[in-house]
Amino acid sequence: MRTYHYIPLFIWTYMFHTVDTILLQEKPNSYLSSKKIAGLTKDDGKMLRRTKRGWMWNQFFLLEEYTGTDTQYVGKLHTDQDKGDGNLKYILTGDGAGSLFVIDENTGDIHAAKKLDREEKSLYILRAKAIDRKTGRQVEPESEFIIKIHDINDNEPKFTKDLYTASVPEMSGVGTSVIQVTATDADDANYGNSAKVVYSILQGQPYFSVDPESGIIKTALPDMSRENREQYQVVIQAKDMGGQMGGLSGTTTVNITLTDVNNNPPRFPQSTYQFNSPESVPLGTHLGRIKANDPDVGENAEMEYSIAEGDGADMFDVITDKDTQEGIITVKQNLDFENQMLYTLRVDASNTHPDPRFLHLGPFKDTAVVKISVEDIDEPPVFTKVSYLIEVDEDVKEGSIIGQVTAYDPDARNNLIKYSVDRHTDMDRIFGIHSENGSIFTLKALDRESSPWHNITVTATEINNPKQSSHIPVFIRILDINDHAPEFAMYYETFVCENAKPGQLIQTVSVMDKDDPPRGHKFFFEPVPEFTLNPNFTIVDNKDNTAGIMTRKDGYSRNKMSTYLLPILIFDNDYPIQSSTGTLTIRVCACDNQGNMQSCTAEALILSAGLSTGALVAILLCVLILLILVVLFAALKRQRKKEPLIISKDDVRDNIVTYNDEGGGEEDTQAFDIGTLRNPEAREDSKLRRDVMPETIFQIRRTVPLWENIDVQDFIHRRLKENDADPSAPPYDSLATYAYEGNDSIADSLSSLESLTADCNQDYDYLSDWGPRFKKLADMYGGDDSDRD
């Protein structure tokens, strides 16, 4: 609390409580009950009677925030029963008794033991009583009184927030409310101006002002622009005592932001933009970006781009990038340098959310000129059509021209073009094409029935730049000609009952034709000219591409004729007329009365061959026995043990011993065909190799095709040069094994062979075991020791 404000407060208290305050400070007070008459005693002992304002004795007043060194005097309690002899004792109870307030039990003087704060508690209720020390009885009934704490201006105003945040739209008029700030003062508002707060602005002029009583902050300047300044800091002061000098004050800070309104149109930073584009770019390609600047923010800065006019409005398009607010120039139609090299566009940028309040400022859009230069590139040939359809009769001769494709070079240089057929689409090489003019011709005969359609691809390539090529599909439809005769649609197993009657239908036949005439099939049936009048059966044309076979006589006999062959002439109505003869086999069968077949001519056929059932069984048994004998003979021959040629591994008599065994090398099993040296179409087949040595694997080189009339010597020299120039070949000093001839000999060298100096050291008896051919040699070296002596 601030102590320098006590003197004015004392003066104010003196004005309202003149007499009471003087008497309280000069003489002791006596506390009387409501039945007594309160009074004051002076030094001369005379009683001053008071009949008015007796209630003042029921309350005391005390200033807060006392800073003196002694205890603060509150007042004095006194009763008429007190004779001054010390027999009475004053007792104080209630709020703060004994701690905040103490009483002299002999004199009744009350003092404040501590400094008091009205803001903490402004009113204390206490009770006082006087008792006789000797008897302990109350000489006066207990009575209640009040101590009120008088306020002093010891609290400055405080705002509800230390920092306020507010916003106001830019371009607002003067007096637009922004925010209201509020400050409170803890002092007593009922006494004086200690709690009367007045607001003023310390920082923020001349942009803002504050209402001194309500604390409402308002705009003070018109048309403040966010683009010029967006943030403002305003300091507001609240001062008590009605703003008079000596009042306490507090401050707060208000951060005010100007919010954006759409008061600025978009503007291009430059009036002309230049872009380049190759003529071969695909549709939808982004050529470049343009951007108009808008100082507004948020949705107020959103804009949309459009092509207003220009000679390329149908060739290009502009797309708005919502994230970057840029206009993207894209290709809408295919470009052609030869047709037009430069396009000029006018592109508009306009706000999508204009504010009607600011439309008077002008149109919220801007226009820029975009120039697009088309760059010439070497383009591939272009066919005059996207695809070709060729129709050709299937009987066209080989080498005949059936159609033509045409391509041109769109470049200004107009390079020459050659045509070819993609053989991946014509594996059988049925068609060819003249490379100069694109005429397509046949290389083989055509057959609609095997392949009615052929889909090939023709390539057009620039002669000067083979990398530039185009492809076009060519659909070749083979048209049908009447080159197939009609024939039976299926194999018919026809029978006739022995008890059949004349005119009975025994079979209906239909035919098929591999041809496909445009007007549909129409077939006719007739007997063959050699048998125009058949005594057994009649052919009836049903006029619906079918024919019925009718019996012509009464009854048939299996014994006389078990099978009839009926030739039928079938022909169509297309040009040229094709015909064929189909023979229908009709068996004679035994049937019941309803015409159901019971048995047919199988037995009759067997009997007609002159073989009975027993004979057939005998033949089958003989064949079976013969097969068994052959199998047994083969099994015995495989089980026969061969006689060993050499009984002992050391016996080499009468045997051929091969010493030049070259096994272990490449496991080639086929000899080299020298005939391929003179075959220009020869190719080396890649074989799997399992080389033993060397272990280094080199890249396989393809054989260069040989032309005719090159002899073997030239070929070998040519291959030798290729091998010498091959970078993948091993160096000259590397070890190359061409023929692996087995392991080394047991003998290290010829020096290991030595002659025996004594015949006694050699035993030649084994020569006699070598057979008759070595008998003479055995006799010469295998004699007894006595003979040798």
Curated annotation (Swiss-Prot):
- Excised during maturation, the propeptide residues are 22-53
Signal sequence coordinates: 1-21
A GO BP entry is:
adherens junction organization
Provide the membrane-side ranges marked Cytoplasmic in the record.
637-789
A GO MF annotation of the entry reads: calcium ion binding
Give the UniProt keywords, A-Z.
Calcium, Cell adhesion, Cell membrane, Cleavage on pair of basic residues, Glycoprotein, Membrane, Metal-binding, Phosphoprotein, Repeat, Signal, Transmembrane, Transmembrane helix
Q: Which residues form the Cadherin domain?
A: 54-159, 160-268, 269-383, 384-486, 487-608
Glycosylation site residues: 255, 437, 455, 536
Task: Give TM regions.
Answer: 616-636
Disulfide bond sites = none
Which InterPro entries does its entry note?
Cadherin, Cadherin-like_dom, Cadherin-like_sf, Cadherin_CS, Cadherin_Y-type_LIR, Catenin-bd_sf
Task: Name its cellular compartments.
Answer: Cell membrane
Entry remark concerning the domains of this protein: Three calcium ions are usually bound at the interface of each cadherin domain and rigidify the connections, imparting a strong curvature to the full-length ectodomain.
What function is annotated for this protein? Cadherins are calcium-dependent cell adhesion proteins. They preferentially interact with themselves in a homophilic manner in connecting cells; cadherins may thus contribute to the sorting of heterogeneous cell types.
The name of this protein is: Cadherin-9
Source species, please? Homo sapiens (Human)
